[in-house]
């Protein structure tokens, strides 16, 4: 399956729910998260793609492709190009470091809140990396 698709979103949700590390590190987290991948024709991504994750107290209550409105109004929205997402999912880059370097943009949400949940962000990316998927 390809990353940032409906099937991938559901598989990531299942992976989050199997992750004991995520359950513990995100135990007090409340709020939806949108992960957005920017279009980049050179990398085979013809249109923006975004995944909506209903994250609540260490569990994923559901995940799907985000609507246009959700991609702009979710409490936390992260956006990056395909190359950055590939590096994140390969474990070559950590999410908080990527935000600090400007590779992963925090489009919406509070940076101080994100810092408090740095381990949860790492555990979320680690769980998503367990999903066998390909990039376009």
Model-derived regions: residue spans:
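Feature captures hydrophobic
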Residues: 1-136
């Amino acid at each position: 399956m390809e990353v940032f698709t409906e099937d991938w979103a559901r598989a990531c949700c299942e992976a989050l729910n199997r992750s004991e590390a995520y359950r513990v590190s995100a135990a007090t987290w409340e709020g939806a998260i949108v992960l957005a991948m920017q279009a980049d024709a050179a990398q085979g991504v013809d249109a923006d793609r975004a995944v909506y994750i209903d994250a609540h107290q260490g569990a994923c209550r559901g995940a799907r492709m985000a609507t246009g409105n959700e991609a702009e109004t979710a409490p936390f929205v992260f956006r990056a190009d395909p190359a950055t997402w590939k590096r994140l999912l390969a474990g070559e880059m950590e999410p908080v470091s990527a935000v600090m370097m400007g590779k992963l943009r925090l489009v919406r949400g509070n940076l101080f809140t994100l810092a408090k949940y740095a381990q949860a962000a790492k555990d979320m990316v680690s769980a998503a990396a367990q999903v066998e998927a390909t990039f376009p």
